[in-house]
């Protein structure tokens, strides 16, 4: 009987768990502390530091079903999604991993056993590839597994040799392929027809056994490791006896749901496949804290959403539709990934808001694009058209390319990139794969942090740095870095500023200006007050006053984070944090500005928890245990297997290594001083605590009292009094404007006496005074109506600015153009202008030349009338 996709996923995890592998949950789609990745795109991403040897875990075998996104950056499958059988923006990667435990024999044996015994794939339908020089893998497949030699293909290209980068861990691969049969076109891997659909790769086994050096040398790793990956959608298609991933159960159900929502009956349209794919990536990205924006990961999400909306529109969707598919997705995948149900309301709202915003410009943008395509003489859409659609209507270039491709056209990508110029800071900027892993700093030194219990302690200098080099001595007055065997100084981490203070010796010591992590060592940066040597004993003393202020702000940050989730929703996730002595700053994911009421509600909730005076409790526990207990793990943070959990009553529980108050009451007072947006989908709150908060409130109270005194009212009535004054001012401004218009009308009537004639044509050129520049337009319209036929040029000087306006009745525009006339005068007063033949305006910056310029009009007109 055919297995469902969910059953295949579970069977894989259970199989390897039975083989002693630790089941590890899928990591976030936002890579943790990895600048080389835009999104998690493989199962091994979360284990990279384990493979590099910079991280230790309690297990040496692991298995996972990893959520992956490939759209943007190096792995960009977006333009092919929906048009091929196996391209997706979101997919699941099944994997088993060995960290210096088993190697090729067991990895190959496990893979073969799972495919042929658990999934019961026919052995004669499988063939494998090995790296051309990997005789060991070839022999295992042939001698141990029993695969005929003719079904083991040696591949010499990079397809069968994997590396993490230009340097670092690498090794040969062995790929397992499934043969769909002779009735499907295509050849085996390595043949000219290998791109056909007959032979489909289903599992890649990577044998990490070398460490590539910068000079190209490959040294054997002391503990070879295994990294494997099998696409869940691909293996499901084979087990369910279909040839396209879009025909498996999950996609068919999503496609049917899409068709029902947009109102179509046929399930064959490729746009249905696009929408079904995109709802998966968009929903999971939002659940992992990514919000639509104009840069980085948020821009990739926006591109995917807008591509889905365009395809829904193409299908005939009426109104917003995309967000309605979240329910169907939760039905399909909510059991495996509970976050879909937990954050369903937030995902739906974010998608709905984004779709509504884009829908306002989609129709107009499509008209512009279709007009451009209809007028196109060649086969390439110009880059400036692509840019206009992006800049004005929010059309990502790949969306325009999508439409063009449907009409057999392409876009001028180079021209688009040129038009974007420095405006374009998109997802590709966040993806940098040129990393030399051998040059990443490693240190055998380790400092013991004792700062939770003490603010001073005796320690020994274990290493000194001067100008980036390790030294034995540091001279008095020299700036450098000191490493201690143990230290009470907190090293900057998790947004909390590093401690300052002094390392005291009999001769003087060292002034610590900042503290940071250097591998596992605590690095004290500053200046030597006296000569220091490795091995010296020091008294490490933290600046206690500053540390205390930081504690207040850090604990308040935890309370505020919990309050934001309570008031705004569980989608709120930390996007950045700064905890200093004088303030705290907190960036978080949210799709709209907070209302004044919401800001006050958060502030009140935090102060209620401060008044409750909860004791702060810390506890060390396993990471999974902490998550199960409800501890909040922050996106972008990397945690050890054992973590420190900081709790404040039942209100807040977070994983945190920072320093905190003993009771929430120690914070004293919490005051939000600003809430603003720093990027699309990211808000920022700045706040103060303790005496700083009190001083802020006192200053505001003083200012309000001063304002009330000026307004001659009490503090409680100041707001009402300001509103009254604003209304009075508006009334007076209207009266003044009315009077100025009356003056202008009167001046216009007086100007009729200044009209001259040139060759029988009425001409008025005049320097008017005493009116607003905005009245010139009305004045010239009235004058044109009164004279019937003629040419008028009016100038006005206001301070150091000149305003000019020219009017020509339509019967004379074949002789005199208003734009040419006003530009002629403007050039003489340091400006320029233009407009229609019958009406044009200009400005200038040389009022001292205005009279001379106006006097020159008659001679200029003599030549034209």
Swiss-Prot record:
<dbReference type="InterPro" id="IPR009000">
    <property type="entry name" value="Transl_B-barrel_sf"/>
</dbReference>
<dbReference type="Pfam" id="PF01411">
    <property type="entry name" value="tRNA-synt_2c"/>
</dbReference>
<dbReference type="InterPro" id="IPR002318">
    <property type="entry name" value="Ala-tRNA-lgiase_IIc"/>
</dbReference>
<comment type="similarity">
    <text>Belongs to the class-II aminoacyl-tRNA synthetase family.</text>
</comment>
<dbReference type="Pfam" id="PF02272">
    <property type="entry name" value="DHHA1"/>
</dbReference>
<dbReference type="GO" id="GO:0045892">
    <property type="term" value="P:negative regulation of DNA-templated transcription"/>
</dbReference>
<dbReference type="InterPro" id="IPR018163">
    <property type="entry name" value="Thr/Ala-tRNA-synth_IIc_edit"/>
</dbReference>
<feature type="binding site">
    <location>
        <position position="558"/>
    </location>
    <ligand>
        <name>Zn(2+)</name>
    </ligand>
</feature>
<dbReference type="GO" id="GO:0000049">
    <property type="term" value="F:tRNA binding"/>
</dbReference>
<keyword id="KW-0479">Metal-binding</keyword>
<keyword id="KW-0436">Ligase</keyword>
<dbReference type="GO" id="GO:0006419">
    <property type="term" value="P:alanyl-tRNA aminoacylation"/>
</dbReference>
<feature type="binding site">
    <location>
        <position position="554"/>
    </location>
    <ligand>
        <name>Zn(2+)</name>
    </ligand>
</feature>
<keyword id="KW-0547">Nucleotide-binding</keyword>
<protein>
    <recommendedName>
        <fullName>Alanine--tRNA ligase</fullName>
        <ecNumber>6.1.1.7</ecNumber>
    </recommendedName>
</protein>
<keyword id="KW-0694">RNA-binding</keyword>
<dbReference type="InterPro" id="IPR023033">
    <property type="entry name" value="Ala_tRNA_ligase_euk/bac"/>
</dbReference>
<dbReference type="InterPro" id="IPR012947">
    <property type="entry name" value="tRNA_SAD"/>
</dbReference>
<feature type="binding site">
    <location>
        <position position="656"/>
    </location>
    <ligand>
        <name>Zn(2+)</name>
    </ligand>
</feature>
<dbReference type="GO" id="GO:0005829">
    <property type="term" value="C:cytosol"/>
</dbReference>
<dbReference type="GO" id="GO:0008270">
    <property type="term" value="F:zinc ion binding"/>
</dbReference>
<dbReference type="GO" id="GO:0002161">
    <property type="term" value="F:aminoacyl-tRNA deacylase activity"/>
</dbReference>
<dbReference type="InterPro" id="IPR018165">
    <property type="entry name" value="Ala-tRNA-synth_IIc_core"/>
</dbReference>
<dbReference type="InterPro" id="IPR018162">
    <property type="entry name" value="Ala-tRNA-ligase_IIc_anticod-bd"/>
</dbReference>
<keyword id="KW-0067">ATP-binding</keyword>
<keyword id="KW-0648">Protein biosynthesis</keyword>
<comment type="function">
    <text>Catalyzes the attachment of alanine to tRNA(Ala) in a two-step reaction: alanine is first activated by ATP to form Ala-AMP and then transferred to the acceptor end of tRNA(Ala). Also edits incorrectly charged Ser-tRNA(Ala) and Gly-tRNA(Ala) via its editing domain.</text>
</comment>
<keyword id="KW-0820">tRNA-binding</keyword>
<keyword id="KW-0862">Zinc</keyword>
<dbReference type="GO" id="GO:0005524">
    <property type="term" value="F:ATP binding"/>
</dbReference>
<dbReference type="InterPro" id="IPR045864">
    <property type="entry name" value="aa-tRNA-synth_II/BPL/LPL"/>
</dbReference>
<dbReference type="InterPro" id="IPR003156">
    <property type="entry name" value="DHHA1_dom"/>
</dbReference>
<dbReference type="InterPro" id="IPR018164">
    <property type="entry name" value="Ala-tRNA-synth_IIc_N"/>
</dbReference>
<keyword id="KW-0963">Cytoplasm</keyword>
<feature type="binding site">
    <location>
        <position position="660"/>
    </location>
    <ligand>
        <name>Zn(2+)</name>
    </ligand>
</feature>
<dbReference type="GO" id="GO:0004813">
    <property type="term" value="F:alanine-tRNA ligase activity"/>
</dbReference>
<keyword id="KW-0030">Aminoacyl-tRNA synthetase</keyword>
<dbReference type="Pfam" id="PF07973">
    <property type="entry name" value="tRNA_SAD"/>
</dbReference>
<dbReference type="InterPro" id="IPR050058">
    <property type="entry name" value="Ala-tRNA_ligase"/>
</dbReference>
């Amino acid at each position: 009987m055919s297995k469902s996709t969910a059953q295949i996923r579970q069977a894989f995890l259970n199989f390897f768990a039975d083989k002693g592998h630790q089941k590890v949950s899928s990591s976030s789609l936002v890579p943790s502390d990895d600048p080389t990745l835009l999104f998690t795109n493989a199962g091994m991403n979360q284990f990279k530091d384990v493979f590099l040897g910079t991280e230790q875990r309690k297990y040496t075998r692991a298995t996972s079903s990893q959520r992956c996104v490939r759209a943007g950056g190096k792995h960009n499958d977006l333009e092919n999604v929906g048009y091929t059988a196996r391209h997706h923006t979101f997919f699941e990667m099944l994997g088993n991993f060995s960290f210096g435990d088993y190697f090729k024999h067991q990895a190959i044996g496990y893979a073969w056993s799972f495919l042929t015994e658990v999934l019961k794939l026919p052995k004669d339908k499988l063939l494998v590839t090995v790296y051309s020089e990997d005789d060991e893998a070839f022999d295992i497949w042939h001698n141990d597994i029993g695969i005929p030699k003719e079904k083991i293909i040696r591949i010499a290209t990079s397809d069968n040799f994997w590396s993490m980068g230009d340097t670092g861990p690498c090794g040969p691969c062995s790929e397992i392929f499934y043969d769909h049969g002779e009735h499907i076109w295509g050849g085996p891997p390595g043949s000219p027809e290998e791109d056909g659909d007959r032979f489909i790769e289903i599992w890649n086994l990577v044998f990490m056994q070398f460490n590539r050096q910068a000079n190209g040398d490959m040294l054997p790793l002391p503990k070879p490791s295994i990294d494997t990956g099998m696409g869940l959608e691909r293996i499901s298609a084979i087990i369910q006896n279909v040839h396209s991933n879009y025909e498996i159960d999950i996609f068919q159900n999503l496609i049917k749901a899409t068709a029902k929502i947009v109102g179509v009956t046929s399930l064959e349209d490729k746009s249905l496949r696009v929408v079904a794919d995109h709802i998966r990536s968009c929903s999971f990205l939002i659940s992992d804290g990514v919000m639509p924006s104009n840069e980085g990961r948020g821009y990739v999400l926006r591109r995917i959403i807008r591509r889905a909306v365009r395809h829904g529109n193409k299908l005939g969707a009426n109104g917003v539709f995309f967000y309605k598919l979240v329910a169907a997705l939760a039905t399909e995948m909510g059991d495996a990934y509970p976050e879909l149900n937990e954050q369903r309301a937030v995902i739906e709202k974010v998608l709905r808001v984004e779709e509504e915003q884009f829908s306002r410009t989609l129709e107009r943008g499509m008209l512009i694009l279709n007009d451009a395509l209809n007028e196109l003489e060649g086969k390439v859409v110009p880059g400036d058209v692509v840019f206009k659609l992006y800049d004005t209507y929010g059309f990502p270039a790949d969306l325009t390319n999508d439409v063009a491709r449907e009409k057999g056209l392409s876009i001028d990508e180079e021209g688009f990139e040129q038009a974007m110029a420095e405006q374009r800071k998109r997802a590709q900027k966040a993806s940098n794969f040129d990393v030399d892993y051998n040059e990443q700093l490693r240190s055998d030194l380790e400092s013991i942090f004792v700062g939770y219990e003490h603010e001073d302690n005796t320690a020994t200098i274990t290493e000194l740095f001067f100008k980036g080099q390790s030294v034995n001595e540091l001279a008095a007055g020299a700036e450098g870095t000191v490493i201690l065997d143990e230290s009470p100084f907190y090293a900057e981490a998790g947004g909390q500023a590093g401690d300052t203070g002094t390392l005291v010796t009999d001769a003087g010591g060292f002034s610590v200006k900042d503290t940071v992590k250097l591998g596992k060592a605590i690095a004290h940066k500053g200046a030597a007050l006296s000569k220091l040597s490795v091995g010296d004993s020091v008294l490490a003393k933290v600046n206690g006053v500053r540390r205390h202020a930081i504690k207040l702000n850090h604990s308040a940050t935890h309370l505020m984070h919990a309050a934001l989730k309570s008031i705004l929703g569980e989608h709120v996730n930390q996007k950045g944090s700064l905890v200093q002595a004088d303030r705290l700053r907190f960036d978080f994911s949210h799709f709209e500005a907070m209302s004044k009421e919401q800001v006050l509600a958060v502030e009140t909730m935090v102060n209620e928890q401060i008044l409750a005076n909860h004791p702060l409790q810390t506890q060390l526990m396993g990471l999974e245990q902490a998550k199960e207990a409800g501890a909040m793990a922050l996106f972008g943070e990397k945690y050890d297997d054992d973590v420190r959990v900081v709790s404040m009553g039942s209100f807040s529980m977070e994983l945190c290594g920072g320093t905190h108050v003993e009771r929430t009451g120690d914070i004293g007072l919490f005051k939000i001083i600003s809430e603003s947006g720093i990027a699309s989908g990211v808000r920022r709150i700045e706040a103060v605590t303790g005496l700083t908060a009190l001083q802020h409130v006192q200053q505001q109270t003083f200012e309000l009292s001063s304002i009330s005194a000026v307004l001659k009212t009490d503090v409680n009535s100041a707001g009402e009094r300001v509103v009254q004054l604003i209304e009075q001012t508006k009334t007076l401004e209207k009266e003044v404007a009315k009077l100025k218009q009356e003056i202008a009308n009167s001046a216009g009537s007086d100007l009729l006496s200044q009209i001259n004639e040139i060759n029988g044509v009425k001409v008025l050129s005049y320097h008017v005074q005493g009116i607003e520049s905005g009245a010139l337009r009305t004045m010239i319209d009235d004058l044109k109506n009164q004279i019937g036929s003629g040419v008028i040029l009016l100038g006005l000087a206001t301070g150091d600015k000149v305003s000019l306006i020219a009017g020509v009745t339509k019967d004379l525009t074949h002789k005199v153009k208003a734009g040419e006339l006003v530009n002629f005068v403007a050039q003489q007063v340091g400006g320029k202008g233009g407009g229609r033949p019958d009406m044009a305006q200009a400005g200038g910056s040389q009022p001292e030349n205005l009279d001379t310029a106006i006097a020159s009009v008659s001679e200029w007109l003599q030549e034209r009338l």
